[in-house]
Amino acid sequence: MTTAKALICTQDRQFSLEEFPVPELRPTEMLVQTSYSGVSVGTEFAVIRGKLDWGPFPVCTGYQAVGTVVAAGPEVRGYREGDTVYYRRNYLPMQRGGARVNTAAGTHCSVAVIDPAQAEGVALLPPGADELTSSMFVMPAVGYNAVNMAGVRMGDVVVVQGMGPIGLGALLAAGLRGAVTIGIDVSPARLELARSVGVDYVVDASSEHVGERVRAIAPGGADVVFEGTGIPSQLDPALQLCRHRGTFVFLGNYGNAPISYHFLVPHGKELTTFYPCNDGLAPARRAVIKLMASGALPWRKTISHVVEAAEAPALYGAIDRNELPDLLGAVIRW
């Protein structure tokens, strides 16, 4: 029987690479040999640290990967052995010490079992798309979906507060639509990355007055503001950056706990607000992969760390202990 290796996290945040048997495929399933799986530091560690509830521990996280189809059941349609695919979910069942492992999305694994007729988020990787870069497709797709939902137009002044991978994805999507882009962060690495990929204005919130900088660019305030930090205390400062009858987007994930902000600011500004969720499904994923392949979305620059699967537990431990302040994006090579 074939075996698989998967990155496992326990409730006390211990990380290990463990081995699991791969059962015989059903007629509608295919087996994918993982090439690369992308790390989502924001969402995955919100789950690992209990900010988001994705079910019980132990858990195999990861929700984006690229690999090659190595076997396909007789009823699989649209895929065959040798195809390269990108995907969001792994349905391989895992047992650990007699207990079921919560695979949540489970793509941090050397193989994936997928029923393409039932699974959301699997598609053929187009020719010319780099596998390593493409394994980080979800975060920019989340940003693209948010920009599409907010209706960003040519000439709009767009602010993103918090330039993690999702926030940067939103900024680049807005820029490709012809918007004037302003990125706000406190991380020197993120600020430099934003400059290198063409963000129009970069604001260091640790040393500059954010409101003054934004008003110098857009005296009446920004047309569209995306709050991407996911930190509730940052909502009020971000709301102040909007113009009258502008648009405000809750781009960050604020977790299970209730949040609050001062009502009279968005009320007085008569803001339109949006709460995007997920990656925009197939249309956004397709667009992101295509733009990566063409070079219009220079996403390889966002990947600062690439590790072998055997090094993944150490990487996750270091991230959990906040030992990698310059980490931008990370990929596991299987």
Model segments located where?
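NAD(P)H dinucleotide-binding glycine-rich loop of Rossmann-like/cofactor-binding domains
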Residues: 88-161
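C-terminal substrate-binding/catalytic core of Rossmann-like NAD(P)-dependent dehydrogenases/reductases
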Residues: 211, 215, 219, 256-305, ...
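Residue-level marker of beta-strand positions
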Residues: 36, 64, 83-84, 111, ...
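Mid-domain Rossmann-like dinucleotide-binding core that forms the NAD(H)/NADP(H) cofactor-binding site
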Residues: 130-208, 212-213
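Short, glycine/polar-rich helix-capping loops at beta-to-alpha or helix-loop-helix junctions
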Residues: 108, 186-193, 257-263
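Glycine-rich cofactor phosphate-binding loops and adjacent beta1-alpha1 units
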Residues: 150, 200-272, 325
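C-terminal hydrophobic helical "lid"/dimerization subdomain
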Residues: 1-2, 236-239, 282-334
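Glycine-rich beta-strand-centered segment in the early N-terminal region that forms part
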Residues: 23-39, 49-91, 126
